Swiss-Prot record:
Keywords: Cytoplasm, GTP-binding, Ligase, Magnesium, Metal-binding, Nucleotide-binding, Purine biosynthesis. It catalyses: IMP + L-aspartate + GTP = N(6)-(1,2-dicarboxyethyl)-AMP + GDP + phosphate + 2 H(+). IMP binds at residues 13-16, 38-41, 133, 147, 224, 239, 303. The keyword Membrane does not apply. CDD domains: AdSS. InterPro entries: Adenylosuccin_syn_GTP-bd, Adenylosuccin_syn_Lys_AS, Adenylosuccinate_synth_dom1, Adenylosuccinate_synth_dom2, Adenylosuccinate_synth_dom3, Adenylosuccinate_synthetase, P-loop_NTPase. This is Adenylosuccinate synthetase 1. One of its GO terms (biological process) is IMP metabolic process. One of its GO terms (molecular function) is adenylosuccinate synthase activity.
Length: 428
């Protein structure tokens, strides 16, 4: 089938955008299936001969290909003002998205009051806050699950929308007290936004099935990552949607048999943003080195990312659930200067190995992490263009990961530039 899926395999920020950008050069439709504008992909591409940096949050980053159509699927939650702010910013930089960006009529809506509530919930949690982006994503998905949310199609029946919207806000007042919010002003604002949004709205299920059955190449761009999945991540320090291969099917309305390839994106070390367990975290000079050399600051929030060694327990868990056909190992160049590199291989409790990745966070907080130490290569790989030219120890690191996961690494990121990606031919 003509559907390729790119998914994050750790806690997000793996660098999915660059691979999507490369693959999007040869595809017809780039689709998002879950999440909202809490995601963050940065892509550097030439526009009219000038390198430009584009920050994507809600919109599919495959739009950098001027021949590619973007689709925001029904599994997303959409803050309409942010949708237009991002679209306007891209077009101001010279990226014309006219007649090639569409949004599902079934996608749920995020409102400003969701963002206010998101902040109030974090304050309420105090020292146990999750560390959300405060974009209102969680409260919007909560409304969806409780069947009280509003969807894109509701915008086009203004009287019904206004009635439902007032009830939604009143419900939040009852839960959180009366916070400052102009309900009637918002209703009027969305009346105008609805008319601007109308040309972008489609039946996304019919749209994507027509694309697939007519032979178009479809690329699905996953947001966040497996370890932030609502079911399989480090709950409750997770996002509020399905970030797995299953979320692709439910968020776009396509069956599993239509998916041809699933590519997992793996950072050469591990990072995460916000609270939650992180067994391989390095609160030492190594952690600082990875943070500084890797420029580990969030695209969406600007927050510093926590850093640690590559964790194979996490990746085995991720690979079992998503069934990767191949991997993209990113930011390998960040390890260039290190004389030795550690990889987390097992979690132990009282000397006994845990069989999988534990659901119990108290248990997870008390695991002993077993590491394997590999020799570094201590030379720059940034200008290398073929796999054979990589240093032997670098290839050894790659092979160790492949052998441990039984999944081939097909793409290797060797620098921040768009061209800094080495393709390794897979054995048939």
């Amino acid at each position: 089938m003509s559907v390729t899926v790119v998914l994050g395999s750790q806690w997000g920020d793996e660098g999915k955008g660059k691979l999507v950008d490369i693959l999007a050069a040869d595809i017809d439709v780039c689709a998002r299936c879950a999440g909202g504008n809490n995601a963050g992909h940065t892509i550097i591409v030439p526009i009219d001969g000038v390198l430009k940096t584009f920050a994507f949050h809600l919109l599919p980053s495959g739009l950098v290909n001027p021949r590619c159509t973007g689709l925001i699927g029904s599994g997303l939650v959409v803050h309409v003002p942010s949708f237009f702010a991002e679209l306007d910013a891209l077009e101001a930089q010279g990226l014309d998205c006219s007649n090639r960006l569409f949004i599902s009529d079934r996608a749920h809506l995020v409102f400003d009051f969701h963002q206010i509530v998101d902040g109030l919930k974090e304050v309420e949690l105090g020292g146990k806050s999750i560390g959300t982006t405060k974009r209102g994503i969680g409260p919007a998905y909560s409304g969806k699950a409780s069947r009280s949310g509003l969807r894109v199609h509701h915008l086009f029946d203004h009287e019904t929308f206004a009635e439902k919207f007032r009830k939604l806000v009143e419900g939040r007042y009852k839960r959180y007290g009366h916070f400052e919010y102009d309900t009637e002003g918002e209703i009027e604002r969305y009346k105008k936004l609805a008319e601007r949004l109308r040309p972008y709205v489609v039946d996304s299920v019919a749209y994507i099935h027509k694309a697939i059955t007519s032979g178009k190449k479809v690329l699905v761009e996953g947001a966040n990552a497996l370890m932030l999945d609502l079911d399989f991540g480090t709950y409750p320090y997770v996002t509020s949607s399905s970030t797995t291969i299953g979320g692709v099917c439910t968020g776009l309305g396509i069956p599993p048999k239509m998916i041809g390839r699933t590519i997992g994106v793996v950072k050469a070390y591990t990072t995460r943003v916000g609270g939650g367990p992180f067994p391989a975290e390095q609160l030492n000079d190594i952690g600082v080195h990875l943070q500084e050399v890797g420029r580990e600051y969030g695209t969406t929030t600007g927050r510093r990312r926590r850093c640690g060694w590559l964790d194979l327990v996490v990746l085995r868990h991720s690979s079992m659930i998503n069934g990767y056909d191949s991997l993209n190992l990113t930011k390998l160049d960040v390890l260039d200067q290190l004389p030795e590199i550690k990889v987390a291989t097992r979690y132990l409790v009282d000397g006994k190995e845990l069989e999988g990745f534990p659901a119990d966070l108290e248990l997870l907080a008390n695991v002993d992490v077993e590491y394997v130490t590999l020799p570094g290569w201590q030379s720059s790989i940034e200008n290398i263009t073929t796999y054979d030219d990589l240093p032997e120890n670098c290839k050894g690191y790659i092979k160790f990961i492949e052998d441990s996961l039984n999944v081939p690494i097909e793409w290797i990121g060797v620098g921040p530039a768009r061209k800094s990606m080495v393709r390794k031919e897979l054995k048939q």
